[in-house]
Amino acid sequence: MVRKRKPIFKKVLFAAVLLYLMLITILTVFQEKLIFLPTVLDSNHIFTFEKPFQEIDFIANDGARLNGLHFRVDNPKGVVLYFHGNSGDLQRWGQVASDFTKYNYDVVVMDYRGFGKSTGKRTEKKMYADAEIFYDYVTQ
């Protein structure tokens, strides 16, 4: 009887390892779609908010359009550079600005590549470079 258990154990172990490898492969292939849930807006979309704002655009080194919003207040104490989460777009995240403008801070929020009006393909390196473009904007 002990001999029969060994082949069954090997089959179960083989199936578990195979299932694990398939799961890892699927997660690797689809990780971008599982992590980032962008909302894409028309390039002619018009934002509307209660607070005054300026729409800002930058062109990255690779030609991608980077879209952002700058919410301004009179005599700001400083500026908040806000990077939103892994979903949505500026239409949704622009609402966060009022949480900071009520305390007299300017707010700049950007859309990542492939979100909202921003174009281009995301990579970790490009996301850092894009963040630097907006950082340079708020520190000038």
Task: Name what the model sees in each region.
Residues I8, V12, L21, K117-G120, ...:
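Residues at structural and domain junctions
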Residues N61-V138:
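Membrane-embedded segments
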Residues V12-I59:
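An N-terminal hydrophobic leader/cap segment in hydrolases
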Residues M1-I8:
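N-terminal Lys/Arg-rich, disordered targeting/topogenic segments
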Residues I8, A16-V17, V40, E50, ...:
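Generic, low-specificity signal for short hydrophobic/alpha-helical stretches with a mild N-terminal bias
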Residues T25-T28, T39, T48, T101, ...:
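Residue-identity detector for threonine
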